[in-house]
Structures are given as C-alpha cells and as structure tokens.
C-alpha cells in the first residue's frame, strides 16, 4: 500500500497574521519555505487601503496573536507591508502588542524589509508598489526615515487586495523595467504582500543586474533566518544566497 507523504512541519512552524482579503501571500510564502517548515495563518480584517482601513486591521491584533499562539508556532509574523510601514514606530508598536499577548517571538514585514536591505548593503532603493498614492508616499517616508534613499519608482493606484491580486505579473515587470531605466539604485523593492511578484525576482535580477526583493520574499527569508534555518530555495533571488548571521537577521 502506498502511503501519501504529508509535510507536518517537523522542523519549524511559522505563524502569520495576514489581511483578510489577501490571496497571494500564502501561496508565495509556501513556495519559498523549505520542506519541514509549515505556515499557519490567522486573518485580520483588511480589504482596502484607506488610512482608516489600514489602522483598523490592528484592532484585533491581540486576538489574532492569541489564536495563532494556540498552534504553538516558533514565531509569529505580522505580515502587511502597508500597515507595518505606516510610520517609523509602527512595527515596534505591533511587536510590543503581540509580545504582551503571547511570549512567542514576533516580527513584522517592516522588520524583514530592513533586515534584507541591510544584508544586501543597499542604500539606494527603487520602490515599485501597487498602492494608491498616499500609501506609496508613506512607504517612501518610512524608508527615508530608516536611512535609505528612494531614487525613484512609482505606484499603480490600486486600492483593494482583490484588485492587487489581479494585476498581471507582466504589468509589474514592465513597470519595474521602465522605472529602473530612469532611476539607478542598489536594489529594487517590489512592495506589497498581495501582488504576484515572486516569479519575477530571478528574471528581473538577470535583467537589471541588481538584487530584487519583494514583501513575501523578505518575510520568508527573515523568518527562516530568525528560526535558525539557512536553506536557500532556488529561484527566489540573491537575498536567500546572501551570507548573514542569525544575530544579524534578528
């Protein structure tokens, strides 16, 4: 009798708090996490991009953290770029609130972005997002406050998770290539957990000659390194091959 092989996450469990309307982050993260590392998700309410909607996602932060803690993950990630980069202090506040709700180590997408940029020794960032203009500008302000120069890029004016998921990867690729031709940078950051960008990383790195990072990629990389896992999944860019100590990734 043939027995079906099921991956029960015997190496590590990563918990993630995600926007309720996001249908892209889970498949992309699962594609990047190596065998034996499981992803366990709780959703927090968010489908749009207004300031009120973004901040309302945090109203159930503690409840979501406690629910995920029941599954005993090794770490819990708050995985929303627009919320965690809303202001320079936001990621720290999110982690602090999660820490009061559960002793399980917490991280946020914003933490992963900064860790990735540091690991790649980048100072000049080309930023391409699907966001509406206010969200895009807040992310520029956050990167600037974090010590990086945003040399250029642009946004696509999309407001909802559902619309973001429908953006053709080819449209994202073409926008990146057009912006990169005008704006030299050390790294290209394709921001947002809700767009289909993971498959663009390797071909864009080949075309641009610089590292390309995405919100889902940096979260997978940062979480794995925080968990002491040094696997390098193929096809997801230079970041995974970048030497970094677990201390540096913390």
Question: Language-model features: where?
Answer:
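Periplasmic-binding protein-like
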Residues: 74-79, 126-127, 185-192
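Short, flexible loop segments at boundaries between secondary-structure elements
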Residues: 158-163, 212-232
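Glycine/small-residue-rich loop that forms an oxyanion/phosphate-binding "nest" at active or ligand-binding sites
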Residues: 65-111
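Hydrophobic alpha-helical
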Residues: 174, 178-207, 219-220
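Short, well-structured alpha-helical segments in soluble
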Residues: 58-71, 171-185
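Short, small-residue-enriched loops and turns at beta-alpha junctions
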Residues: 82-87, 160-166, 196
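N-terminal glycine-rich anion-binding loop in soluble enzyme alpha/beta folds
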Residues: 1-63, 134-168
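Conserved beta-alpha
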Residues: 94, 98-161, 240-248
